[in-house]
A protein has these predicted regions:
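Active-site environment of divalent metal-dependent phosphoester hydrolases
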Residues: 17-19, 49-52, 81-84, 110-113, ...
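Glycine-rich anion/phosphate-binding loops
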Residues: 83-90, 221
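Acidic (Asp/Glu)-rich catalytic clusters
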Residues: 55-70, 93-99, 142-145, 168-170, ...
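Active-site-adjacent C-terminal substructures of enzyme catalytic domains
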Residues: 103, 136, 143, 163-164, ...
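Divalent metal-dependent hydrolysis catalytic cores, especially in the metallo-beta-lactamase
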Residues: 11, 17, 29-53, 70-82, ...
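Internal active-site segments that recognize and position negatively charged phosphoryl groups
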Residues: 136-166
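Active-site gating loops and adjacent loop-to-helix segments of metal-dependent hydrolytic enzymes
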Residues: 37, 100, 104-136, 203
Length: 231
């Protein structure tokens, strides 16, 4: 089997160093690899909040090392974990003003994440109350709409995802990505994925591998091929 060209590829979900756990690349190393293969864009992500400032510095690095015409741009976003105050419209707005391209719901602070990791889900960030999203999340949705960026569902449960997506659509959000629905923490059924696409016109993110814990990873490629056929 020959090599697959990565020219023009866009990757919207890459974790890099610095982080609280070791990643394969730091921001500059990832940019080096991206330029080498002719990638168009990468969105870097951290569970620790902001990556917009890191993306800016990386783009400056790329210009200095490779010149102005690489065709590659690195972007950042905001993850609404407890480290930035959870569902924090002010923090999100600052990130958007700095150029954030994706705003993620909670990851490690999500109730679903804590439950799947054997921790107390009650300590997670509340997104839905009495069947509706919390008011501050509506404010975040309006910002996402106004800046025309992407909402990522991150590590929320399938049940939360339906409520959140409907509210986001009602608020005028146009670009919604269901973050790695096949990951065992999210664990969204095929039927739910089909429903979300059919009813709300969302994008299903497909990751090539999933973290199984303890440093172990599982290839998603065979399962994702079947999921793509089904959806």
């Amino acid at each position: 089997m020959g090599k697959i060209s990565m020219k023009g590829v866009c990757d919207m979900h890459v974790h890099t160093n610095p982080d609280l756990r070791l990643r394969a690349y730091d921001d500059f190393e990832l940019a080096d690899a991206a330029v080498r293969v002719g990638a168009r864009a990468i969105v870097i992500k951290t569970h620790l909040g902001f990556t917009v400032n890191r993306a800016y510095l990386t783009n400056q690095y790329v210009k200095k090392v490779y010149g102005e015409n690489t065709g590659f741009t690195m972007y950042g976003g905001v993850v609404m974990n407890k480290v930035i105050g959870g569902i924090n419209p002010e923090a999100v707005e600052k990130g958007l003003k700095l150029g954030a391209k994706e705003i993620w719901l909670p990851t490690q602070s999500a109730k679903r994440h804590l439950e799947k990791m054997g921790q107390d889900p009650a300590k997670g960030i509340e997104l839905v109350r009495d069947g509706k999203v919390v008011p501050e999340l509506v404010d975040v949705f309006k910002l996402i709409r106004d800046y025309d960026v992407v909402l990522g569902t991150a590590h929320v449960s399938p049940e939360e995802a339906f409520v959140v997506v409907e509210a986001a659509k009602d608020a005028g959000v146009k670009k919604i990505v269901i973050t790695h629905p096949e990951w065992w923490v999210v664990d969204m059924s095929i039927d739910d994925q089909i429903r979300l696409v059919k009813d709300y016109d969302v994008i299903l993110e497909r990751c090539y591998a999933q973290n199984m814990g303890g440093g172990a990873y599982k290839s998603n490629l065979p399962d994702n091929l079947e999921l793509i056929k089904a959806v």
